[in-house]
Amino acid sequence: MAKVLTAVRGAVCVENTAESITENVCHMCRELFTRNNIKAEDIVSLQFTITDDITVLNPATALRKGNAGLDVTKFPLFCSQEAKIEGGMKYVIRALLTTYVDSADGNIPERNNVYLNGAEKLRPDLSAKI
């Protein structure tokens, strides 16, 4: 069985509190890992972006402090600020998880993106598949 490189996306709306950020980031990541049958050893990296109104805790720190169901010390985490877009959704954390997955034929299997807690509005075309 071949390993192919792919990515899966996620987003979650949060309140600007450490508790909300930790709880929601861990929940989103658990769902990404579970729905896509991802193991820590197959993850290349996990990148987050946050809107500029999230100021109390970055999602990588939240994930390290919380419980996402995998050992998150096994792969790099990275955070950056989302571009500020007029009229854009507020209090959003977005994720891009790059990972290897098993593929019998070398094709990339369907990925299950995760949009939670109001972030479904960002990509209704992807959220509907879940």
What are these regions, as identified by a protein language model?
Residues 1-130:
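Terminal domain-initiation and capping elements
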